[in-house]
């Protein structure tokens, strides 16, 4: 069977899993690589988070089996200095910690990058304590089907993610990459729990701190990427938001915003320490007040002129996340036309994307070939 047909077969199997026909089978079917260095890059955003609770080994594994080039773990730290995969340090929304009476006293209120947040925070738990918790779906109102997996998966360490990627690379006979993000580095550094030394140690220990490794390291902050540029041989990616500014710059009194960073001049500065740009997709093609796509900006062109690849985020199948152009109905949780959205952004020149729905992105690429 050809590579393309095999991958489409995997996509079809995954589609059956969505309607409950064969979820376990979808997890077992392998998918081959879909290109070399110049191919379109598909990043499994928090794994295959459209189908499994995010940042679980099950989610990462499903993304890899669906054909993702990379899986993306967001990294935070425990009280005892172990990197774990969670979208935020606050874990009330992504684990069952609220159901553990022994941890009721850990609930607290903190300032997270200038925002008041109440809940339970990874830095207040040892790894052993975190391992007693189980993950749950973060947005059950949109992804109700994912809730059948609530309570089944642990919070993984970054080392466990690396181990999984190595095992799957051997099993699937292709190299699967990792695309870790350092979450809130200034916040953790101020608590004496800097993320960067742990990240560098783990990449070194696993033989991944080399230019040929299939690794990107990303951050919404600037300072830690500049520091990592001095010690890492893997490419770095500057993440940007459609509004606001990097918190490290805000904290230092630096007036630069994400808009400044994504200007032609700002991108030239980014290219001094990074090889890629990870913008909000609305920075590539904005939406009007009604949610419809407008004209593409010059961001992709300017980034390419600065020598940067462009991997925007996040492409999701549900109507609530799609531009109005591609929604199928007013029901937030129903699928719209993610195929069409990806096609428009590929036509705008992006080099890859982050998606919760790896199977759809892979199928779109294969059908467009």
What residue ranges belong to the model's regions?
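Phosphate-group recognition and catalysis centered on beta-loop-alpha active-site segments
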Residues: 2-11, 18-369
